[in-house]
From Swiss-Prot:
Biological function: GTP hydrolase that promotes the GTP-dependent binding of aminoacyl-tRNA to the A-site of ribosomes during protein biosynthesis.
Presence of the UniProt keyword Protein transport in the record: no
Annotated HAMAP family: EF_Tu_B
Pfam families named among the record's database cross-references: GTP_EFTU (PF00009), GTP_EFTU_D2 (PF03144), GTP_EFTU_D3 (PF03143)
Region called G3, residue ranges: 81-84
UniProt protein name: Elongation factor Tu 1
Compartments where located: Cytoplasm
EC number assigned by the record: 3.6.5.3
Native source species: Shewanella frigidimarina (strain NCIMB 400)
Length: 394
């Protein structure tokens, strides 16, 4: 069977369902697939296909995730749904499924529950920029006032975590009734799709962001100078661009005098490409793996940050024992390990394998970082945790 060609003509947006267990995330995912494919064309995925989420491994962590795709007239969406709460935690922290926006599913029959709150907090910590609310099971609530009350509660909860609770879209619907084909409830799914189209802005493509290349290797070429190699993470570097070398040591400026790929000289290196960048007047010993090459002023080196961390379970190849304050592992950022110390939240004495935890990390030397940067925690080359920079402190 021939592979379907990927149509590039519509903007591509990544979304996902979040919310408390049994509030109807997977049913809603199936309803979106059914209603949108019926209305705008496309392949339908039923509940069983979505619910039977395949196991994936991201940095050694086992995550069950379902991926579906659907179209609206103006966009193409990739949507992730996870069967279990632990899968959401892992997914959001590792960035296995980066979300441009999330659909928070809240059952009108229950209102916000503990995992509702935890998923909102996680979204805030890992940098999910936009949330849309789908109040589900509204067909089971006869009382108009009760629906208003639940909506108010959800909006207040979102505001508590710095999302614009008063302004974001809340759609009242029933995923099950929409899935059964009842027109009044199908209309609510179309309303949700319209909210996705209008409320979540089109994400900036990697190529349009400021240039960044994590340095993997450094060579000196006699008569030409120093070449750094790596995969361009974002943006474009052109010959004669001024660039900064950031992290590990004090930041220095230099100029790109050449770009090479597969031994050919190019005018530019673009996001996603592996290339070598020739640097003017830079000595071989001035640069090392673990630094980044970046557009001047676009990224700064930092040592201390608040992070959200998932600690691998024993079954995932992680630690067999808890760790305590004073733990000093390596933190792997992009291409290199840096030793760091941790500070646990007040009242937390130890962290067990399989836990997720907020911690403040202080590295022994600075690394180029922004909020949202992912890292691994390692001991002697073995991954024992995954984390994300939630807030830079220093």
């Amino acid at each position: 069977m021939a592979k379907a060609k990927f149509e590039r003509n519509k903007p591509h947006v990544n979304v996902g369902t979040i919310g408390h267990v049994d509030h109807g995330k997977t049913t809603l995912t199936a309803a979106i697939s059914a209603v949108l494919s019926k209305t705008y064309g496309g392949e339908v995925k039923n509940f069983a296909q979505i619910d039977n989420a395949p196991e994936e491994r991201e940095r050694g962590i086992t995550i069950n995730t379902s991926h579906i795709e659907y179209d609206t007239p103006i966009r193409h969406y990739a949507h992730v749904d996870c069967p279990g709460h632990a899968d959401y935690v892992k997914n959001m922290i590792t960035g296995a499924a980066q979300m441009d926006g999330a659909i928070l599913v809240v059952a009108a029959t229950d209102g916000p529950m503990p995992q509702t709150r935890e998923h909102i907090l996680l979204s805030r910590q890992v940098g999910v920029p936009f949330i849309i609310v789908f109040m589900n099971k509204c067909d089971m609530v006869d009382d108009e006032e009760l629906l208003e009350l639940v909506e108010m509660e959800v909006r207040e909860l979102l505001s508590e975590y710095d999302f614009p609770g008063d302004d974001l879209p809340v759609i009242q619907g029933s995923a099950l009734k929409a899935l059964e084909g009842q027109p009044e409830w199908e209309a609510k799914i179309l309303e949700l799709a319209e909210a996705l189209d209008t409320y979540i802005p089109e994400p900036a493509r990697d190529i349009d962001k400021p240039f960044l290349l994590p340095i993997e290797d450094v060579f000196s070429i006699s008569g030409r100078g120093t070449v750094v190699t790596g995969r361009v993470e974002r943006g474009i570097v052109r010959v004669s661009d001024e660039v900064e070398i950031v992290g590990v040591r004090p930041t220095t400026k230099t100029t790109c005098t050449g770009v090479e790929m597969f031994r050919k000289l190019l005018d530019e290196g673009r996001a996603g490409e592996n290339c070598g960048v020739l640097l003017r007047g830079t000595k071989r010993d001035d640069v090392e793996r673990g630094q980044v090459l970046a557009k001047p002023g676009s990224i700064n080196p930092h040592t201390t940050f608040e992070s959200e961390v998932y600690v691998l379970s024993k079954e995932e190849g992680g630690r067999h024992t808890p760790f305590f304050k004073g733990y000093r592992p390596q933190f792997f950022f992009r291409t290199t390990d840096v030793t760091g110390t941790i500070e646990l939240p007040e009242g937390v004495e130890m962290v067990m394998p399989g836990d997720n935890i907020k911690m403040v990390v202080t590295l022994i030397y600075p690394i180029a970082m922004d909020d949202g940067l992912r890292f691994a925690i390692r001991e002697g080359g073995r991954t024992v945790g995954a984390g994300v920079v939630a807030k830079i402190i220093a």
